[in-house]
């Protein structure tokens, strides 16, 4: 509970003793909302209360709503492989080489435009409050419109571009407000929210595959548009700020000087490299499984195992960032994903071994982004240390996550065409051991190398570069 008075102008923004800089630190230390909007004048003093940080029903309802918005918004583009398989084999889209562009636009644009959308929402708080509903409506309209498509180009615009823009508008308030609701448990909170994608990645492809097989893509898209509206609209009520607008008006979201600090640039390099390799197993694991004798259902199980393991891994990694230095967390992710790729996928010629790899990869590679809260803390600390508290007070740490998303988006977009180069002509086939000799050897090796390199910040931190 927080109380503010006109004499002390104090707002409790985080638990006492929490040294993590947040975007909620106000100029002149704190801000007092106008009496007519947030306070009650009693004996010449203005008092108002705020919900508690790191707990209480409001915080947990907010986190639960964010979990499901994350799952429903990101789960659909992460399940695009089901649509890609359907579009490739059914008219009027069969045989088109542009079908993968739909999924690339849906996911890539959502990653790339997050800092822009977050910045606009920070500048216009009233727009931010209504954004979950506005974005949801745009997503549903885009899905409904895509059900009338007669060519791939129309699908790219509707199911790809418009859906991505709507998804970003709906999702970004979750990132902006999370910093207000959680302080000591911030890493855990982000980890729980981001684990929603893994859960959706497990269940949604199964549901969509059944609907596509029974009803076709037009009816499936309309059903999902209605389901998305019904499931998500009630959640929008709980996605709300903890603080009054007056407490955050000083923040300058497009003050991006942090992106030029050495700490952030080194983290961004490792983050982008990880993004280059991270998405490749999601594209090729089912195909690889079929190449070693798996059935179509067993092949689909590979992605389901990765997503289920990622759900657990995100929550665990988020909690670890609250207790360990971020570079240690990133090294744990890199070591597990790299060794799993080289030793398990690299020598997997049987389905059980491949399943073990899927679980290991999901546990370690999937939660890499859950460590972003630690990067945010690292960068915010450097901004305060080297530029002074007053100089960095209007800096918005949540934009660190936004710019990191851009780096991951670049990796996502580049990984598509890059993967085609890596498997073209089935290199190393019959010339190497295990999985390396199946024609997917360069792809496996590249995935492993990028996974290991994503932990380079652990070394850079130890040698004093950051």
PLM feature segments, named:
Residues 1-56, 384-388, 465-466:
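Intrinsically disordered, low-complexity terminal tails of fungal membrane proteins
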Residues 65-67, 71, 139-143, 152-169, ...:
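Hydrophobic core of transmembrane alpha-helices in multi-pass small-molecule transporters
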Residues 184-188, 192-243:
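Helix-loop-helix hairpin linking two adjacent transmembrane segments in secondary transporters
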